[in-house]
A protein has these predicted regions:
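Catalytic-core "active-site belt" of small-molecule-metabolizing enzymes
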Residues: 2-204, 245, 253-261
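Short, intrinsically disordered/low-complexity patches at protein termini
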Residues: 94-95, 217-219, 247-248
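A conserved acidic, glycine/proline-rich C-terminal tail/linker
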Residues: 209-237
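Low-complexity, intrinsically disordered Gly/Pro/Thr-rich segments
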Residues: 232-236, 240-248
């Protein structure tokens, strides 16, 4: 376990990297004994510093939801980070690429809660009952820690690599559509790069919401009404650069477009 002083030091480094859109050396290279618990402590100190600076928390992101990603990182469950109000874009947005580091895009669904959701025994049915609506979303990944050799400890510390999200226009209640079969066809500059289906996220995209409620219970917290939960990607990340035009077709849930400037 890392000392509180080291946790605070690393959180400060990440806050500065976020401010300057830069990258710091791997935490696990400097502190090889750092644990997942340490990484959530670092994320928590960073989060609290951002709230103290005036940013408003609007929701949570869930990452590492696919079996392949979990096996690749040697973990057995997803991870999570926080989302602030100044990181939310609407379809059609122009997004400054130099606001982020190691910029990639993932295809996801987001869920808006209509009432609080609390563990420890939250199920998929409980999560679906708590969801007001689903909306298509693109996640902009933003890594402030060098990618080579990075582990889950580095990623969680770095707010689970969350940078921003772009929300679509189509809202669907969970009883209006079989969310497992929502498709995603992701294009860059007119060329299809990635495809997937939402069932690739833990078998059902809302499963992660139940997992998150149970995980939060371990930390003495719950998910609150009106929080946005970004539920995990059902495609591989796609790299983007300045000038790229991105389009994702979600079939019955419409499309999302954005341009990186």
């Amino acid at each position: 376990m890392l000392s509180p002083d080291i946790v605070a030091q690393i959180a400060g480094e990440l806050a500065e990297a976020d401010r300057t859109h830069s990258v710091i050396p791997r935490i696990t290279a400097r502190y090889p004994d750092a644990t997942v618990e340490d990484s959530y402590a670092i994320q928590g100190v960073w989060r609290d510093s951002q709230i103290a600076a005036g940013r408003r928390l609007v929701g949570r992101k869930i990452g590492l939801t696919s079996k392949a990603m979990q096996q690749a990182t040697g973990i057995t469950e997803p991870d999570y980070g926080v989302m602030f109000d100044d990181t939310v874009y609407e379809s059609g947005a122009e997004i400054p690429v130099d606001h982020f580091s190691n910029v990639r895009i993932e295809v996801e669904l987001a869920f808006v809660l209509k009432h609080p959701l609390e563990g420890p025994d939250c199920t998929l049915d409980d999560a679906l009952a708590a969801i007001d609506y689903a909306v298509p979303a693109l996640e902009v990944l933003n890594s402030h820690i060098e990618l080579e050799g990075r582990t889950i400890v580095d990623t969680i510390s770095d707010n689970a690599a969350y940078g921003a999200m772009v929300l679509g226009d189509v809202h669907k209640r969970p009883d209006e559509i079989d969310l497992r079969w929502v498709p995603g066809v992701l294009s860059r500059n007119g060329e299809i790069e990635e495809t997937g289906v939402a069932a690739g996220v833990l078998g059902h995209p809302a499963t992660g919401v139940a997992w998150l409620a149970n995980k939060f219970h371990q930390h003495g917290a719950r998910l609150e009404a009106r929080e946005v939960i970004l539920a995990g990607s059902f495609t591989r990340p796609m790299w983007v650069s300045r000038g790229d035009q991105v389009l994702c077709d979600y079939g019955p849930m419409g499309t999302i477009e954005c341009r990186f400037i």
